[in-house]
């Protein structure tokens, strides 16, 4: 099962596995840039599609956040030449 847009709790994952017999995989997307990251099959972390996307996590001033600190997501799409998305 592929989940997009909402947090899926551990209990929801277990229920989906029990009912449907399927593993739940998270993806991170936006309509304008498409798929940005997909959950790793080995752990719960997401891997960014670095071949076509640059993702930055920044604070309210636009400064890069330290690893693990929450912040705003800025996306630069590296594949869209007709309508570039830069720090969107």
Spans of features found by a protein language model:
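Active-site glycine/GP-rich loop and adjacent strand/helix microenvironment
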Residues: 1-88
């Amino acid at each position: 099962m592929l989940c997009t847009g909402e947090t899926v709790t551990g209990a929801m994952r277990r229920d989906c596995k029990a009912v449907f017999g399927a593993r739940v995989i998270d993806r991170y997307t936006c309509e304008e840039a498409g798929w940005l990251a997909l959950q790793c099959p080995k752990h719960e972390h997401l891997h960014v599609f670095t071949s076509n996307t640059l993702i930055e996590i920044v604070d309210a001033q636009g400064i890069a956040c330290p690893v693990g600190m929450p912040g705003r997501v800025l996306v630069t799409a590296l594949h869209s030449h007709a309508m570039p998305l830069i720090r969107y």
